[in-house]
């Protein structure tokens, strides 16, 4: 299984915010983009998805930015993946036209939906706090 880049960026952004203690103060998206070596438009798009998902809140203005909406321990990795990944995993029908009306109801696609849900359920017990490595040498590499 491969996560979309946006989901990977989202997990990195949330981990960055958790590691910097950004529950109290907003962090500008440009600062996050620079720290994570992500383009600002990608960071902005991902931040918008995280806002829509209720994982971060935004503050406008000169000292604005984004901050965690909840404690890192309360943000499930499974919930983040469910929120940002496409809602359905679909495989094309074999031997049929690409836009087959039955595609979403085929046995293969029902199995893929079940697999995606089990994948997310496996991630549910883990939180963003579990991704934060507080060792100084790791933090130094992350910020380089």
Language-model features, listed with the residues they occupy:
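Alpha-helical residues within the helix-turn-helix
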Residues: 34, 51-52
């Amino acid at each position: 299984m491969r996560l979309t880049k946006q989901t990977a960026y989202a997990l990195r952004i949330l981990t960055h915010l958790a590691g910097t203690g950004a529950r109290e103060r907003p962090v500008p998206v440009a600062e996050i983009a620079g720290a994570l070596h992500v383009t600002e438009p990608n960071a902005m798009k991902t931040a918008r998805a995280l806002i829509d998902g209720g994982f971060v809140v935004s503050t406008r203005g000169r000292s604005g930015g984004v901050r965690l909406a909840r404690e890192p321990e309360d943000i499930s990795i499974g919930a983040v993946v469910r929120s940002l990944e496409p809602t359905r995993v679909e495989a094309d029908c074999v031997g049929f036209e690409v836009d087959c009306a039955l595609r979403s109801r085929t046995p293969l696609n029902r199995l893929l939906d079940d697999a995606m849900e089990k994948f997310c359920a496996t991630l549910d017990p883990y939180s963003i706090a579990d991704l934060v490595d507080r060792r100084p040498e790791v933090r130094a590499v992350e910020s380089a």
